[in-house]
């Protein structure tokens, strides 16, 4: 119970970091940590295969885009989160998160949530989550190929867009 609450609060903490970033560098790190803690929450609840697939697809596809975004920005002196502006942005989102928790506690019945997992129905020879790999390659093979093609196409589009801007932004290289 306490571990899932710890990762839940960590997830909200990193989401606040994503939404209140004042520099691209901290936003990317916060987004990667948000994905990591979200996948840990999924794995803790019993969806280990889903967490692994989401984490690998997310990091494999999106970090390429983030790397090119950081290359485009090239801030020599990025602002830090400890600056007054960053503290004010983070404070707004913390207050908003606290209000959502207080309002949602009564409306959505958050207090009744337990620490049940996917396999809480009883003992079984095969876990519910372990059949995901065979289904991914059997039924979901076409969708997997389309996602791969989309990521590949996005990679080349961003590469072409960044190519001309990189020469303008960094004339010394």
Swiss-Prot record:
Keyword DNA repair annotated: no
Segments traversing the membrane: 12-32, 47-67, 94-114, 142-162
GO MF term (any one): NADH dehydrogenase (ubiquinone) activity
Annotated membrane topology: Multi-pass membrane protein
Protein name: NADH-ubiquinone oxidoreductase chain 6
A cellular component annotation (GO) from this entry: mitochondrial membrane
Electron transport in keyword set: yes
InterPro entries, sorted: ComplexI_Subunit6 (IPR050269), NADH_UbQ/plastoQ_OxRdtase_su6 (IPR001457)
Lineage, uppermost ranks: Eukaryota, Metazoa, Chordata, Craniata, Vertebrata
